[in-house]
């Protein structure tokens, strides 16, 4: 079973964090939510409280198939300011394992860590200048090697289905999308 860690910082964007968690779990992926704050309870940018599965200090993360960074502000900024998160992301990328980020996180975190150098990437409008060394695509979802980026809240579903296809397979991703009636929305 594939293993994903999702880092939750105060100020995360609700939809961008929870839709991928939901879709991946429906697809049989082992997803662990991780609080990077001082408490398991993390508050979203819109005041929704989520209790993470573990605290950052409890994680090893070396078994991660994917590290996922939700967007939202100040959530993305809080992720970047956490030295432990930055080390995990850099190590994950250096090992050639998957890293994914959505909204502000591609620029605020991945760009500033040098992970996007020479890659194609997307992000929420206004954060393009932070995609250091990347070619901005303006697409909802962009995949370049082991890095997947997405634009913003509206991209949360296609982003989640792309991650599921990468981790499990396209057939499973399509089945989950059908069961969630996503394909009918896009018709």
Predicted regions and their residues:
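Active-site-adjacent pocket-lining segments in enzyme domains
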Residues: 3-6, 12, 27-36, 53-187
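Short glycine/proline-centered loop/turn elements that form peptide/ligand docking sites
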Residues: 18, 35-38
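Histidine-anchored nucleotide/phosphate-binding helix
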Residues: 21
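Short N-terminal binding/cap micro-motifs at the start of the first secondary-structure element
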Residues: 12-16, 41
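A cross-family phosphate/adenosyl-ligand binding-site feature
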Residues: 41-53
């Amino acid at each position: 079973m594939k293993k994903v860690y999702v880092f939750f910082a105060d100020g995360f964007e609700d939809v961008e964090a929870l839709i991928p968690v939901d879709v991946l779990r429906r697809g049989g992926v082992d997803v662990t939510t991780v609080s990077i704050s001082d408490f398991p309870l993390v508050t979203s940018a819109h005041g929704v409280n989520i209790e993470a599965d573990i605290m950052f200090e409890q994680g090893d993360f070396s078994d991660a198939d994917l590290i996922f960074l939700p967007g939202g502000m100040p959530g993305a900024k809080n992720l970047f300011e956490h030295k432990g998160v930055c080390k995990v992301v850099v190590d994950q990328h250096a090992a050639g394992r998957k890293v994914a980020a959505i909204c502000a996180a591609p620029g605020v975190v991945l760009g500033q860590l040098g992970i996007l150098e020479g890659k194609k990437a997307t992000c929420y409008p206004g954060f393009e200048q932070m995609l250091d060394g990347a070619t901005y695509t303006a697409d909802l979802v962009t995949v370049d090697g082991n890095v997947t980026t997405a634009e913003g809240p509206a991209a949360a579903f296609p982003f989640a289905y792309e991650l599921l296809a990468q981790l499990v397979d396209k057939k499973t991703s399509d089945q989950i999308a059908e069961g969630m009636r996503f394909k009918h929305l896009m018709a």
